[in-house]
């Protein structure tokens, strides 16, 4: 039986650390790899699945840079009041649920809602977010191979060269999209794994490296959350110091944003 975690109070905001040029230079000279961007994706199962308390517990546990949700109801929008951060919801036409994104830092640009080829019953949309370094599409695709592939073609046509498509793919076989690789975890993600192992939740990526991935334990939903750590593939010919300075700036920016809303830094 699932026991919802107790209420979580918002921590006192703290001052974001100043980013001094000397800090950037020191970190750049270390020339480590660009920091991986942590994305968690979870199908919440509408009203009968994960509640806002379960989503809060996931945020507190995983500290994602971006949380993607499918079958999110209007009630999930209270995340901003409960844990801070930034939230965008794209309801499916005529439905009580839709797609949602949460981030501890401001979205570089507002997420776009894109209409998809749809079946007779459910009209599908996807959310597209441009992070600057790469694009992210949050999807809950239709059953049926032909319609599924048409939806994927529509989605990737509007994505930048570096991009990731995450969410509930609703397919059992391979998701074939030219130029994209399936970089998500390989373990089953659906509750029917005792009967039939289904890997419905996936991440396809282009121009990105997946540093790590995982399937998280099951909660009250029939889907398990998936986690991927993505970073852009290095550009040929870019000076090492410039790569290091960009990576250092990104690390310090995220640390400052997390300090403002009281989340722990997962890289520490």
Residue ranges and their predicted role:
Residues 42-49, 114-118, 140-145:
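Short, flexible loop segments at the rims of nucleotide/cofactor-binding pockets, characterized by
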Residues 145-212, 217-218, 239-268:
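Metal-dependent phosphoesterases centered on the DNase I-like endonuclease/exonuclease/phosphatase
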Residues 37-44, 55-77, 136-139, 155-178, ...:
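Active-site beta-strand/loop signature of hydrolases that rely on acidic residues for catalysis
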Residues 118-159:
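Internal catalytic-core helix/loop-beta-alpha segment
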Residues 1-81, 233-268:
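N-terminal, active-site-proximal structural segment of metallo-dependent hydrolase catalytic domains
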Residues 2-25, 29, 48, 66-134, ...:
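Structured beta-strand-rich core segments of catalytic domains in phosphoester-bond hydrolases
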Residues 95-110, 131, 195-210, 230-232:
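Conserved beta strand-loop-helix elements of the APE1-like EEP
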Residues 2, 127, 199, 221-229:
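Structured catalytic cores of enzymes that bind and process phosphorylated ligands/cofactors
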